[in-house]
Design a protein with these regions (language model features):
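C-terminal, surface-exposed recognition/capping segments
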Residues: 96-99, 131-147, 153, 160-163, ...
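Short aromatic-cysteine micro-motif
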Residues: 2-168, 270
Length: 271
């Protein structure tokens, strides 16, 4: 068992979900893959062709709202995943949940052998956005599909350095997360924002605790302010062609539009 906080000590807010304190959460091992028949506009859209597994093309070209509603639809009655809505909550990754995973890479539970010796997570540099592909951190874009998640090369791109970690957090596609500046809807597709428990709202130009300000520039990972009305939504990790700028601590801003190099991932918590 892994204990993240000491007794009587408050956990980082990734483990607070609404009014509940979580002991943990399940984070998508790969970027969401599969297809959608059409963009999701509510929590009951058809997500029967959505998958979270290696060696598939990630789901892209969706606005933030479509990714969000797709993740929420995974627990609807009669879903193909076996989820029971009274037992679990499925949702799109929030920025602080990404941050919690990023922090763990910099620990003995991730890429560190001790308190001072850590290695960077490798990049998914596949030009077809195939999930679970990986190479060394500074590798250039490649069409090669043989560096799959269970090979020696691809384990470089795991958050733990072995097959049990999380993939596609460096490179692949830029991952939209539910983090926004001053509740600015912009081009996200939302008519109104969902319950606050499903997103992080930022009102200042810097913020610690979500692997943003305090880890800015680590491993030379790309960073750019999202604190503008034109790019209020967080995207994380970079994409396959960003080379050494890619990484779990990379972040940038976007309007929320349905870009071809934008993907997402989902999270499960107990209800």
């Amino acid at each position: 068992d892994v204990t993240f906080v000491k007794q009587n000590e408050t956990a980082i807010d990734a483990f607070t979900f609404g009014d509940k304190q979580l002991s943990g959460f399940w984070y998508g091992k790969f970027e969401i893959g599969g297809t959608l028949a059409s963009s999701c506009t509510n929590e009951t859209c058809n997500v029967s062709n959505i998958v979270v597994k290696p060696n598939v093309s990630s789901l892209r070209s969706q606005k933030v709202s479509s990714f969000f509603y797709a993740a929420r639809s995974m627990e609807q009655t009669g879903n193909s995943f076996g989820f029971v809505s009274s037992e679990v909550d499925t949702h799109m990754s929030k920025n602080n949940e990404w941050g919690a995973v990023a922090y763990l890479t910099q620990s003995i539970y991730g890429r560190c052998t001790n308190s001072t010796t850590c290695t960077e997570v490798g990049i998914n540099n596949n030009t077809s956005y195939i999930t679970g592909i990986g190479d060394k951190p500074s590798s250039t874009a490649s069409s090669v599909k043989t560096n799959t998640y269970n090979t020696i090369s691809e384990k470089n791109a795991s958050t733990t350095g072995n097959i049990y970690g999380i993939y596609d957090m460096s490179g692949g596609a830029w991952d939209y997360v539910m983090g926004v500046y001053k509740k600015t809807i912009s081009d996200s597709g939302f008519r109104s924002l969902p319950d606050i428990k499903y997103y992080n709202n930022y009102t200042e130009s810097s913020y610690t605790g979500h692997a943003i300000s305090e880890t800015k520039g680590w491993y030379n990972d790309q960073s750019f302010s999202v604190y503008f009305s034109v790019s209020p939504w967080f995207i994380r990790g970079c994409f396959y062609d960003d080379g050494e700028l890619s990484g779990v601590f990379a972040f940038y801003g976007s309007s929320g539009i349905n870009g071809n190099n934008r993907a997402s991932r989902f999270v499960i918590t107990n209800e």
